[in-house]
Amino acid sequence: MTKKTLAFASGSDHKTKEMQMLLSPFGYEIVTPKILGIPFSPEETESTFVGNSFIKSKELFRLTGFPSFADDSGISVDALGGEPGVLSARFGGPGLSDKDRALYLLNKLGTNHNRKAHYSCVVSFVDANHQVSFEGKVEGLIASDYDELGKFGFGYDPIFYYPEFGKRFSEVPEGEKNKVSHRKKAMELFLEWFQTIQ
């Protein structure tokens, strides 16, 4: 089977690896701006995951001509009015590490008994004939502390407890997490649609 190329608008090696794992069984190969040697840093100015995802996919399609997709994802905490949401990667200010951002969130949430949270991912796709988006979510709880021992995941995974696993995402190997992840759910919807236009 000949591999088909899709351009993925991300500079995150973690996300690219996760997307490639999800796409390879379907015969798709991912290229990124980094792989193509293209400078790529569009400003994410929208207030929704959908809006920010489209900023990236439209710009990558404009630059490369490849069918392009992007994701915008983050974590939303009920007791914080949906924060950090679209600001997940910048929560707490510039220059913070993933761990610092997670600790900042824990501190902001404090002892609030409402620990409900969800990860959201919106995947948008743009080519000459289409502009579509798909959303996936995974519901969980914010733990009371930061998992220093977990070997897996990234971002807010060390504080995101997934009741169905009885574990935090940082304690779950990528293959297992990918079965339920917000990104996988959005990608499944995308792939289901994408195969109908082939």
UniProtKB/Swiss-Prot annotation:
Binding site for substrate: 10-15, 73, 154-157, 177, 182-183
Gene3D superfamilies linked: 3.90.950.10
The protein's required cofactors: Mg(2+)
One biological process term in Gene Ontology: purine nucleoside triphosphate catabolic process
Top-rank taxon, per record: Bacteria
The keyword Transmembrane helix belongs to this UniProt entry's keyword annotation: no
EC identifiers of the protein: 3.6.1.66
Catalyzed reactions: XTP + H2O = XMP + diphosphate + H(+); dITP + H2O = dIMP + diphosphate + H(+); ITP + H2O = IMP + diphosphate + H(+)
Family classification: Belongs to the HAM1 NTPase family.
General function of this protein: Pyrophosphatase that catalyzes the hydrolysis of nucleoside triphosphates to their monophosphate derivatives, with a high preference for the non-canonical purine nucleotides XTP (xanthosine triphosphate), dITP (deoxyinosine triphosphate) and ITP. Seems to function as a house-cleaning enzyme that removes non-canonical purine nucleotides from the nucleotide pool, thus preventing their incorporation into DNA/RNA and avoiding chromosomal lesions.
PANTHER family tied to this protein: INOSINE TRIPHOSPHATE PYROPHOSPHATASE (PTHR11067:SF9), INOSINE TRIPHOSPHATE PYROPHOSPHATASE/HAM1 PROTEIN (PTHR11067)
Protein name: dITP/XTP pyrophosphatase
Organism encoding this protein: Leptospira biflexa serovar Patoc (strain Patoc 1 / Ames)
